[in-house]
Design a protein with these regions (language model features):
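His/Glu-based metal-binding/catalytic segments typifying zinc-dependent metallopeptidases
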Residues: 109-165
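Phosphate-proximal small/polar/acidic motifs at interfaces that engage nucleotide phosphates
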Residues: 168-169
């Protein structure tokens, strides 16, 4: 996020319009909306449960000062990664880093200390006037760096991660109960979830 962006109010208003359109598109895409509802149901009132795009009300209300304050609070050297590849002069790169980023302050950096926990088991539903019923199930998974992530990836491939998976073969090919059905793992820094999705006729 380039700090100079905050100086151009016209650009901010333009980008807000783009994000509002993205939010509307998600609301009109049942599959996307179902995954968002699953995150809310599984993680409850925790940051990871919130939609990445935010809400239309939040986006409309944001000001330049709001974004500048967020940038100052969240973007620090301690949580940044600088990646360099190709034919370069390391001494020159170091010099440029010092020139461009040397004054980047870490004074107000506060690392997150709270761990994300799944909410109590429950169900979240939203009625929409559409032809299909979209269903998502969530189960506790593994966080990033867990040694068993390879096993979970293999399990997911067999269970529901491909057209040859058991979910796909049983529910779509054999039973004809749904056209779309799959599973997938999500891994975050301190939590994870294994999800199953299907779209079918309510009858």
């Amino acid at each position: 996020m380039n700090k100079e962006f905050f100086e151009a109010l016209a650009l901010l208003e333009k980008e807000k319009g783009v994000v509002l359109e993205e939010i509307s598109m998600c609301e009109d895409t049942p599959e996307d909306l179902t995954h968002e509802l699953l995150m809310l149901a599984h993680y409850g009132d925790q940051p990871v449960a919130r939609p990445i795009l935010g809400s239309a009300e939040q986006i409309s209300a944001y000001t330049r000062d709001d974004l500048a304050a967020y940038w100052g609070a969240k973007y620090h050297p301690q949580n940044a990664v600088l990646s360099i590849a190709g034919n370069y002069d390391w001494a020159r790169v170091q010099q440029m880093i010092g020139e461009k980023l040397g004054a980047w302050s870490a004074e107000n950096y506060r690392p997150r200390s709270d761990a994300t926990q799944p909410a109590a088991p429950g169900c979240l539903a939203k009625d929409k006037e559409i032809e299909q019923m979209h269903i998502c199930l969530g189960f506790p998974g593994l966080k990033i760096g867990d040694a068993q992530n390879y096993e979970l990836s293999l399990f997911n491939s067999v269970f529901g991660g491909a057209m040859s998976s058991r979910l796909f073969q049983k529910i779509r090919e054999e039973s004809g109960m749904a056209y779309t059905v799959y599973s997938y793992p999500n891994a975050y820094t301190d939590c994870g979830m294994l999800s199953v999705y299907a779209a079918t006729n309510p009858d």
